[in-house]
Amino acid sequence: VLRPLVPALLLVAVSHAAASQALPESQALPEAPACRALFADGRAPTLTNPKLADRAVPLCFEAFAVLHSGVSRTPLYAAERLTRRSVSAARRVERADAFHDEDRLPEDDRASLADYLRSGYDRGHLAPAGDMPSAVAQAESFSLANIVPQNRAVNRGLWAAIEESVRRLASERGEIFVVTGPIFEGRSVGAIKGRVLVPTQMFKAIYDPRTGEAGAYLVPNAAGAEWRAVSLATLRETAGLDVFPALPEASKAKAMALPEPQEFSRGGPESFADFLKQLAVDVLRRLWSELMRAIF
């Protein structure tokens, strides 16, 4: 059930005027020290819209970091460092969906499983389960602190293809930093169950530390959505967030050539080998499970 946004929650909507400069140091949000390795040059994304800072809480997980908003009851971003090795490890982890509430957050400031029940929206990951290099990391990715209400067609189609394309890019280049987040823009922002804000758009920003290139995918959170590439400077104005604050303005002014979103490709030897390995692992696990059930 999608309900109109109550006026108080409009505080989270991005204002282009408010996004013109970073928060002063006195308003800077604390960083989780253990998560600094997940940020480009060890610096967390910076909120440039002060309205987004209200009831914002940073959380550190094994393979990603989030900044969670008690106003929207969603994450404002999830940050990751993807490498060739981590992507290869992630392909060997069997997916086990187990969405759960995030107990580290105040109950009134977080989403619950009940909020998403019969909402008409998918529980969309910011840091994808498919990026997680271990079973523990994958389980953590199903925390609702890493989830936003996402259009089903987008989540299962275009967005899934973007996630896979980013993993392939990490495999090709060796290391990239990724920041993913929602955008709440305009006066038509809605909320499921009157509690959890529904993004109007989604972004996935990428930075290659070897070449200095950066850019972002921008996708409307609606059926029939098409993606476009934007610079980090454009994203900052739209989202109220400087995703890679350590980068020079010259790198933020131009969008890198982003790979065309596509699902898992068997076109290259490396990706085909990974596919065959994962297929073999999945088949063996199913056979083992069936054998155990037959015996016991």
Walk through the language-model features, giving the residues of each.
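Domain-level detector for secreted/extracellular nuclease and nuclease-toxin modules, and
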Residues: 4, 11-296
